[in-house]
């Protein structure tokens, strides 16, 4: 599939020491069919040829753009923001021109080499057209009502269209999960499921104004909570199935495996990670969420420079095995860190004075966690005669790489290497963008240009890419064999900030993988797919680690802490700030031993006691206690909630507490009031039963014990 901007090759920086070559003339050269091609011709054909990915950048940009837009509107957005979000999504998923849904289908079909059946394709496209048309009508009605919220007619129209559209999503979602074709349909399912959940959220935001009853609003809310789990589990299951089906043994199979992993993360899993944050009862104000997962762009190596000479493609040139490449490229689960410096060591591949390639042979990476100590890792050859090149990246986001995949031929033995890389970066806190480049020199070799933005495009078009970039470089891996040196870049999402800043007027979600250290006994483990990154685990009591947080004033602002966790045991969570204890509470098991982590095994719980930060920068610590070794306790993230935020669950708890207290006399807390009847106690019991397990499980148990005591007193009195 051709790139839309294939002929718009952006040049390397002006300080480059390489002669510019016309990309148009090169394109013409590569289209010429040559007979009896020789050594020099093969090199000439591949010179500055642009490597085409499976899909245009605009297709991936759709997934990146939608996730990025939603990240900016989490919580309960203003009515105008909701309408604007629908307008954006309609433009992305139902644009004029070629059907975006077909492009999604074709992309996955090509990666996994599986065609969707004609019936399933046509059924899905027909249902998607209907949903798009209905969503556009609802969007127009919503905008009309937002412009005149007191208009009875506008309110009635948007309400009826909302109910009809929501039911339509319920009916049509199964068309995107056809048995046997779940994997190629997965991006479509994820986007449609995401829209359904956003739509269900509207009932909680606007339902009261539209005239929906409390029970109707509750029905939509409960459906949203239930479907969020169902949709999440479906996406993770079929992502994992598709990925495992692509696992192979050689380098070529790794290429498609990695492409599926990257693109399905961008188009599916990033959306799934946001589903819990659509809950308006949990997130009634602006909410900041972060994606900490890593994705990997294609290896920098020549690909098909000539069809009759297959070994000139890096993965056919005696490249390492699938498992060796994974080990070289994908780090073990680790705390989120940021790249600070790269030192590059070069090797020389030489045929003659006019044909040679100085290429990337090894490197030393320096990186650190947020507020942590410097870490160093090395790969490849680091003891070479060529002077190393050191590139500083402290406090800089590398948002784009332009790399040359080089090919040097020794008679019939190709050598694959990387003779040049341009790292485009910007300072995090200043509007200054520039680049550093690695270029030790080469001559007479074949090269192909690989631009990271073809695989990780910016979130939006129409802005400079140093403003709208979606990812930052986090790590570099090296695939190394006797005749292959291929780089693989690792990237994190821009939403994972460098500062762990807590805002006074919004809910701040901080994944625990952003801690700056790990306590003894704690481990980072692979995320289950729906958390947006890796998670932390303990199997015995102790602290997980420390998070360095920065506080935006006012410092008088008070917060409550919430924890998203999963556990095979009842336990206590303890929190502290700068070593001073803040909260301690009992919480219950969410899963059984041996059970897989899925959406329902995670629960978000909170402490009721508020606190303030006294310093601009503080260290927050969380630990798990009072459980037997051998159990498993996982934490996804910590949430800091301004205390002014009131919750329906909190109101219900206070009301239930008052009703329970009212059963007893004021002079004797153990004495039942004389006018309390059996049905009074039953009413209070039902009220306690309706309390949220998520927030007040232990308090609920305590109130039940008091109600039972009241029941016992009533029975004894009647006897």
Swiss-Prot record:
Report the InterPro entries cross-referenced here: Galactose-bd-like_sf, Pest_crys, Pest_crys_dom-III, Pest_crys_dom_I, Pest_crys_N_sf, Pest_cryst_cen_dom_sf, Pest_cryst_dom_II
List the Gene3D superfamilies hit by this protein, alphabetically: Galactose-binding domain-like (2.60.120.260), Pesticidal crystal protein, central domain (2.100.10.10), Pesticidal crystal protein, N-terminal domain (1.20.190.10)
Q: Function of this protein?
A: Promotes colloidosmotic lysis by binding to the midgut epithelial cells of certain coleopteran and lepidopteran species. Active on Plutella xylostella and Bombyx mori.
Q: Which Pfam families match?
A: Endotoxin_C, Endotoxin_M, Endotoxin_N
Write the protein's name. Answer: Pesticidal crystal protein Cry1Ia
Which family does this protein fall into? Belongs to the delta endotoxin family.
Keyword field: Sporulation, Toxin, Virulence
One term of GO molecular function: signaling receptor binding
Miscellaneous comment: Toxic segment of the protein is located in the N-terminus.
The species this protein was found in: Bacillus thuringiensis subsp. kurstaki
């Amino acid at each position: 599939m051709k790139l839309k901007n294939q002929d718009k090759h952006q040049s390397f920086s002006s300080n480059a020491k390489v002669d510019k070559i016309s990309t148009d003339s090169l394109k013409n050269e590569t289209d010429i069919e040559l007979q009896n091609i020789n050594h020099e011709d093969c090199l000439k054909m591949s010179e500055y040829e642009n490597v085409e990915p499976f899909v245009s950048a605009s297709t991936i940009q759709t997934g990146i753009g939608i996730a990025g837009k939603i990240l900016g509107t989490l919580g309960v957005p203003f009515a105008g923001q909701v309408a604007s979000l629908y307008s954006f999504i309609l433009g992305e998923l139902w644009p004029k021109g070629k059907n975006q849904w077909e492009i999604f289908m074709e992309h996955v079909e090509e990666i996994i080499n599986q065609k969707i059946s004609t019936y399933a394709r046509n059924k899905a496209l027909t249902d998607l057209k209907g949903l798009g048309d209905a969503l556009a009508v609802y969007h127009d009605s919503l905008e009309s009502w937002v412009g005149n919220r007191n208009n009875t007619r506008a309110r009635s129209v948007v309400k009826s269209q909302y109910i009809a559209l929501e039911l339509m999503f319920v009916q049509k979602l199964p068309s995107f999960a056809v048995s046997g074709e779940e994997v190629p349909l997965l991006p479509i399912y994820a986007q449609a499921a995401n829209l359904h959940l956003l739509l269900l959220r509207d009932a909680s935001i606007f339902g009261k104004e539209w005239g929906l009853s409390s029970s109707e609003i509750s029905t939509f809310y409960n459906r949203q909570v239930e479907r969020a789990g169902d949709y999440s589990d479906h996406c993770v299951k079929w992502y994992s199935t598709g990925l495992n089906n692509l696992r192979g043994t050689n380098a070529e199979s790794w290429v498609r495996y990695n492409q599926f992993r990257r693109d399905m993360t961008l188009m599916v899993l990033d959306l799934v990670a946001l589903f819990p944050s659509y809950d308006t009862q949990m997130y009634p104000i602006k909410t900041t969420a972060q994606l900490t997962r890593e994705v990997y762009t294609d290896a920098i190596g020549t690909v098909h420079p000539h069809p009759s000479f297959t070994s000139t493609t890096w993965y056919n040139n005696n490249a390492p095995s699938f498992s060796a490449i994974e080990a070289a490229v994908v780090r073990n689960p680790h705390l989120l860190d940021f790249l600070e410096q790269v030192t590059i060591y070069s090797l020389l591949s030489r045929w003659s004075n006019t044909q040679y390639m100085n290429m990337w042979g090894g490197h030393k990476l320096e990186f650190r966690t947020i507020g942590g100590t410097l870490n160093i890792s090395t790969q490849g050859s680091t003891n070479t005669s060529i002077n190393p090149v050191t590139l500083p990246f402290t406090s800089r986001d590398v948002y784009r790489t332009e790399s040359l995949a080089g090919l040097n031929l020794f008679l019939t033995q190709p050598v694959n290497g990387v003779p040049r890389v341009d790292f485009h970066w910007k300072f995090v806190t200043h509007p200054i963008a520039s680049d550093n480049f690695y270029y030790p020199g080469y001559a007479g070799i074949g090269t192909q240009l690989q631009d990271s933005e073809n695989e990780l495009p910016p979130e939006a078009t129409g802005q400079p890419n140093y403003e709208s970039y979606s990812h930052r470089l986090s790590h570099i891996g090296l695939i190394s064999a006797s005749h292959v040196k291929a780089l693989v870049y690792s990237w994190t999402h821009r939403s994972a900030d460098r500062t762990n800043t807590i805002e006074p007027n919004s809910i701040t979600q901080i994944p625990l993988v952003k801690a700056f250290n790990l306590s003894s006994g704690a481990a980072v483990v692979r995320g289950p797919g729906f958390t947006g990154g890796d998670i932390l685990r303990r199997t015995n009591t102790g602290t997980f680690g420390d998070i360095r947080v920065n506080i935006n004033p006012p410092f008088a602002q008070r917060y409550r802490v919430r924890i998203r966790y999963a556990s095979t045991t009842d336990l206590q969570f303890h929190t502290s700030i700068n070593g001073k204890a803040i909260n301690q509470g009992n919480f219950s098991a969410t899963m059984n031993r041996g059970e897989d982590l899925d959406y329902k095994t995670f629960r978000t719980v909170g402490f009721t006691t508020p606190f303030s930060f006294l310093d601009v920068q503080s260290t927050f610590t969380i630990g798990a206690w009072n459980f037997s070794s051998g159990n498993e306790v996982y934490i996804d993230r910590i949430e800091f909630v301004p205390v002014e935020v009131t919750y329906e669950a909190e109101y219900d708890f206070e009301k239930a507490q008052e009703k329970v207290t009212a059963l007893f006399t004021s002079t004797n807390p153990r004495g039942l009031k004389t006018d309390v009847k059996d049905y009074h106690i039953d009413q209070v019991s039902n009220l306690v039963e309706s309390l949220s397990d998520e927030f007040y499980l232990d308090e609920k148990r305590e109130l039940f014990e008091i109600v039972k005591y009241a029941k016992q007193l009533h029975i004894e009195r009647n006897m």
